[in-house]
A protein has these predicted regions:
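Short functional micro-motifs and their immediate structural scaffolds
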Residues: 81-82, 102-103
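Conserved beta-strand segments that form the floor/walls of ligand-binding pockets within enzyme
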Residues: 30-32, 93, 111
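Long, charged N-terminal interaction/targeting segments
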Residues: 1-65
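Short cysteine-rich clusters marking metal-coordination/redox-active sites
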Residues: 73-76, 94-97
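Short hydrophobic/aromatic patches at helix-to-coil boundaries
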Residues: 114-118
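Cys/His-enriched microdomains
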Residues: 71, 89-92, 110
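Short, flexible, mixed-charge glycine/proline-rich loop motifs
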Residues: 61-69, 83-88
Length: 118
């Protein structure tokens, strides 16, 4: 259950930034999490509310935006969206040139994108 450790870091970042801004309350936290990250959103939300209890972030809404996994062919530059858990990535070849040499463009992110305070 790595969601707990990740969420502890998120709450720490949120509280440090809210304290620096002299906030009275954190009302919303927006995360951007890539599809490649193996995160259970419900579990992360539950962990967030558990960890934030008793802090100025205890009533904050946690919003999680999933970032699609996009790969790019190193040979021709063609980009492709991969869907995880479909076996899509195991035998992927470029539809344009037929090669199978890719690198990740996006989908591995884990960002605290926005913190709303009052």
């Amino acid at each position: 259950m790595h969601e707990m450790a990740l969420t502890e870091n998120v709450v720490d970042i949120v509280l440090r930034n809210a304290t620096m801004a002299e906030a009275k309350e954190v009302t919303r936290v927006h995360l951007q999490i890539g599809e490649l990250r193996d995160i259970v959103e419900k579990l992360m939300t539950d962990c967030f509310h558990y960890i934030a209890k008793g802090t100025i972030a205890e009533n904050a809404a946690l919003e999680i935006e999933r970032i699609p996994l996009i790969i790019q062919c190193r040979n021709c530059g063609e980009k492709k969206h991969l869907k995880l858990h479909t076996g899509d990535g195991r035998t992927t070849t470029c539809e344009k040139c037929g090669m199978s040499n890719f690198h990740i463009i996006q989908g591995n992110e884990f960002l605290v994108d926005d913190i709303e305070i009052i």
